[in-house]
Amino acid sequence: MAATLLRSLQRRNLSSSSVSAFRSLTGSTKTSYATHKLASLTRPFSSRPAGNDVIGIDLGTTNSCVSVMEGKNPKVIENSEGARTTPSVVAFNQKSELLVGTPAKRQAVTNPTNTLFGTKRLIGRRFDDAQTQKEMKMVPYKIVRAPNGDAWVEANGQQYSPSQIGAFVLTKIKETAEAYLGKTISKAVVTVPAYFNDAQRQATKDAGRIAGLDVQRIINEPTAAALSYGMNNKEGLIAVFDLGGGTFDVSILEISNGVFEVKATNGDTFLGGEDFDNALLDFLVSEFKRTESIDLAKDKLALQRLREAAEKAKIELSSTSQTEINLPFISADASGAKHLNITLTRSKFEALVNNLIERTKAPCKSCLKDANISIKDVDEVLLVGGMTRVPKVQQVVSEIFGKSPSKGVNPDEAVAMGAALQGGILRGDVKELLLLDVTPLSLGIETLGGIFTRLISRNTTIPTKKSQVFSTAADNQTQVGIKVLQGEREMAADNKSLGEFDLVGIPPAPRGLPQIEVTFDIDANGIVTVSAKDKSTGKEQQITIRSSGGLSDDEIDKMVKEAELHAQRDQERKALIDIRNSADTSIYSIEKSLAEYREKIPAEVAKEIEDAVSDLRTAMAGENADDIKAKLDAANKAVSKIGQHMSGGSSGGPSEGGSQGGEQAPEAEYEEVKK
C-alpha cells in the first residue's frame, strides 16, 4: 500500500506526562467501570431480588419508553402515572427536589428556568457548536459552557451535563421496569438516533452508567423499529422514516430469513417536533406583538404557556382542520390584562412548518442513493416517531417513496419494543433474529495539507475493522499525531473531531520511510477504537475515542454518587409523604371517635387526646418523618384509652375489674393506614 504522508507536527520534547495524558488501553488492568462497579449498582435501599432481564429503552428527546421481553414478545411497561411513555423532562423545585417525567412537565409553566427538556439535542455537543447556539435562543433554561468546552445546562444555580439529565430520566424508566418485574434491573439496550456521531453515542452510554445501568448495546432507533416490525416473519426491503421530538433518521433495511441488514442510513440530528413547536411559538409571539404591541419573547412564564399551547395545537391539528389557542391573562399593560385568542387552521400550520418538512427529503434521497436502490424497490415504508402523525408529513413521505406509508407499527412504542428484542437476542432468548447495522458517518484521520483521509466509509456494516499504512511528513520525525475525524467533507477542519493522540518513539529516518499502521475498530455499538503502530519497532498506542469533551471516569463516578443521593432523597420524601398520609387518616378517625364517645369518657382523657392530635398536626407541618411517627404513635396510644374506659360497660365510669355486663364498647374507630 502506498504510504500517505501524515500531517506534519512541530517536533518537541515529550515528557512522559504528556504521553500519559492520552488514554492508553494497552497494558491497562483496570476493570471496566460499567461491568465492575455499575452493573450491580441499584438504589441502596432496594429490597428487590436481582434480575437478569435486559430491558429495552427508547430514550427520546420529548418522551421515553421502556419494554421488556415476555416470552417471545416485547411488552411496553406503563409508568407509575399509568402512561406508556414518560416525558423526558427533569425539574428542580424551590426546595431543590428532583422531579422527573409528568410531575416535572406539569410544573414547567411556573418554573420555566429550572425545568429541563429537549436536552438530548445537547448530548455529546460542544458549547460553541452552531446548533447549541441556536438552541440557546429557544429554551427558557440556561445552556452553559462546561470546563471541558461541552454544552451543559444549569438549574437552581447548579450545572449538569446532558448525560446527567438523561440519567435522571433513565433512572425513572429503570424504576418503572423494576416495579413491574418485581426485581432490580442492571442491564439495558438503549436506542439512539441513527445519525448520532461517536461523541453522542459515548455520552448516551455515560448516561446509562450514571443511572446504574450496564448498557449492553447501543442500537439505532430506525433499526429497532424495523426489528419490532419484522419479528413476525415480515420480509423485504423496508424504509424507516423516523421523525421524533428532536431528531430525524431514515434507514433502508433488507429483512430476509430473520436477518435484518441495514443497507444505508441518513438523517438530521437537529430536526424534530421541538422545531415544529418553535415555529408555531414564533408565529404566536409575532401575532400577539402585531395585535397588542407586546413582545412575549421577553417573558419566560408567558413563553412557557405559549410553548405548551403550541404543542397541544400541533397534536390537535393532526386530527382536526382547525383549533383554538386561548390563553387568558397572558400579559398586561397600562390598559389592563391581555388575552391571547387565535384560531389556527391546519393549512396555516402546514405553511409555518413546510420548510422543516422539506428538510426530510434530501436525507431520504441520499439514503436511497447510498443503498443503491430505486424507489420502486422499496416494499414498505414504516413511520416512526410522534411527528409522523402530522398529515402533511405522511403526504411528503408518500411523495418521496411513491407509496403510502404502512401503519404497521406504533410510532411511539416500536423503538422501545425493538430494543427489548435486541436485549432478548443478547440474552439468547431470541435466536431466530440477527441484526447487521451500519456506521452512519465516514471515519478517518487528518493527513498532510489538512486532508480528510477516510479509513471506513459511511454505511459500512458494523462491527468492522480497517487498517491503512501511513508515514512521516518530515525527516527524522520521532513522533506523529493521529487526529481522528468523523464526517463526509474533504477537508479535515470541516469534519467532527473525535480526538487525537500521539505515537512516539519512532526511530529517526528520512520522511516517507517509517511504516505506521493506523487501525480503526468499530464495535456493535458504533463506538470507535483507534490504534497506531510503528511496524519497525512494534510500538503501539491505542485509545477508545473520547472527544476533547465528554465525561471522565471521575466525573461519571461523582455523578453516580449524586444520582444515589437524589434517589435517597426521593425515598425519604416518599416516606415523609406516606407517614403524613397515615397521620392524616388517623387524625380523621381519632376525631370521629372522640366526637362519638366524648360524653362517656373523663374530661382529662379527652384533653389528652386533643393535645396529642394537636402535637401530631404540628409535627405534620415539619419535615421530620421520625417526629411525625412518634407523635402518631402517641396519638394512637392516647385514643386507645377510649376503649379502656368504655370497657367498664354502659354504666359510665371506669371500673377496675373490666366489664360487669352490658354492651362492651368497641376499641376506638381509628386505623393506621400504610401506603
Curated annotation (Swiss-Prot):
Protein name: Heat shock 70 kDa protein, mitochondrial
Transit peptide segment: 1-52
Family: Belongs to the heat shock protein 70 family.
Subcellular location: Mitochondrion
Highest taxon in the source lineage: Eukaryota
Biased composition (Gly residues): 649-661
The keyword Mitochondrion belongs to this UniProt entry's keyword annotation: yes
Recorded name of the encoding gene: HSP1
